[in-house]
């Protein structure tokens, strides 16, 4: 049931290039509070006004947003994003769920065709390609062949989805990285809907770095796959109206600093500030000196600094970027006219600015060349402190900034033979150097900077050691076009940075294997070797299992460290080598390109027709994609033999009516965890360990170890993913004596794989909980980090704090998030994890309130109070329905 929109009275007409458009004109509300609102909140306001029907979106919601100054962080609002963005690791399980929902819809007597996206959905296949082959001119071709061999089942399923679901566009493998493709091609900036109705573009994506689009002035952030599926099916998102931190930029970046240095600085500062669950909106004259690509780099890492968004309102630079990337003049004109008419066009040089919850300031001129690491993206180190910091980490106690080595261990070296030559390496040896990730490959200034540095190095005859795994994996074919046009691909190739693929690759751990002699040497001497990458995450175990120190850096610094061969170097005092041209030592400063030269190269080599040429072919696919044979029809014909695509159990026993959720009594603790447990720890994306439960399952199905592929590629199969839950080899569980995916089966004291213990608990009818520290679930927006625990029988997670997306995912799967009271944790309460737990939460949903106190008791006589992290009333409904998808399915059936 819907009613007429009470705000139709503010509908207005906009003329642009002889075309007439309609829009909901916020100025016609004649409310002085609008001008004070942050730009990001104005976009939420427009959505509420346009979608108001007093059923899903109410007039009270509009008033709450107008009154943001007094209601921020106090009220819940509905939000209807304009579109949904997927990548294949999270997109495959989303489409699997939609296919399973169609089956359930038919079983329960409904129309399966009702399960169809109601908003545009774009899926870019970018997570499957790996750096199997590198340092050769045909690496791209070889890696793509291997990718199709490994993933033909998944790709076939996605191709079926493209024809089965209306409004689902799929960019085939090799198109680029989802967020760069979104920035350069997919993003509309302003949507043109039915009846020429204009409204702001907005997006939610099943990848936490969806925020990259904030650099273009588009509202967008990462959500769990299950929440995205609900949005696809027309369900408004329920969210707490966020506080907005205003971050003022003054001055401009010094010549030697890059956008990467800036984002690592911003990430460090905002993590210290604490912005989880908040919007960050950038303002001040300094912003006007940054290109859209610079801004997108900063927005990309919003998950790393903890914010829901890192938002840059649109300005003239935004309009120029749209033109430079080949958007049509007609679109650009109505975009500019609409944003100006709607009060969404920003003048960063203006002295006036919106009211913010709180403000911060950064003088851009103070930014210096930087890296972050060795284990977290917000642990920034200035380049001139890098050598000292790394050596300090070697001897410091094991932790985020320590490896706990003794003085004797620090002296260890390893000698090995590679391609008939002997090499000796020590701690800090660079073994992976990757120009990777949409964070940086979308930005011509740092990419061409790397190319120019490579050119200068080659002119001096400098080389990169052949055992170092170097790779170049840009986020779109546009990079290849401008590298080719500028002549800079050739020097990069000479240093080993041949094109390896268009996808996430090393940034998400798809780094492939190291050379065998090198890997054996590292393992034998237990060396702390390093990776240097232009990515956005460096959590332990993510980039490669053998690399314990990983540093985020700009593309030019990636090339520099590859040349150096070690992170244990002071570039100011130690040369990269001796010039074959002059016979003199060559320092980094001698080959670092000037900002003027970089800008000249951008002007001459990055051309609008490159974007048009690359993206005009995106719908055509490639030969391998086009030759894929796929089934047709509304319902997917599940193949029980498939180890990639499997009909999940989420809806198989679901009934039309809702049953009361059972009480949690005498539950055992499956894991007792510490701080900063990431979604990589909970549901790894990388290679499947040959000794794991998932490996045993695959072998039982006749899959050879060389064909195991990665956990990320297997997310369409629940049987593998439940066995891969908590299977990270670096997970630290206090119920196990050593690091790794084991736990104690409490009833007998037996040590076993976590997944085996979960299966044993379930077979004996025991409920499960997890104890955890702060920032539980940080990292990627990985729905299997909630689906896996759900299938393992985990009913509740008790933590000091939760990362935003993961908390939402837990609720979306019907798992209860409980938060310890301030100052308390498992240790202070004397909990070992060997107790049995009773969670005193009412089973009647009408008795449950958001944020209420929930008492937990144990069989040892201990009791403590926790905070229920159902943050909005609708989340109580999701839990009562055993998850958001069951809730939506029942809604569609009724």
UniProtKB/Swiss-Prot annotation:
Cofactor(s) in the UniProt record: [4Fe-4S] cluster
PROSITE patterns to which the protein is assigned, alphabetical: ACONITASE_1, ACONITASE_2
One cellular-component annotation, GO: cytosol
Top-rank taxon: Eukaryota
SUPFAM superfamilies recorded: Aconitase iron-sulfur domain, LeuD/IlvD-like
Major place of residence: cytoplasm
Subcellular location: Cytoplasm, Cytosol
Reactions catalysed: citrate = D-threo-isocitrate
Residues annotated to bind [4Fe-4S] cluster: 438, 504, 507
Similarity-based family: Belongs to the aconitase/IPM isomerase family.
The protein's role, per its UniProt record: Catalyzes the isomerization of citrate to isocitrate via cis-aconitate.
Name of the protein described by the UniProt record: Probable cytoplasmic aconitate hydratase
Lineage: Eukaryota, Amoebozoa, Evosea, Eumycetozoa, Dictyostelia
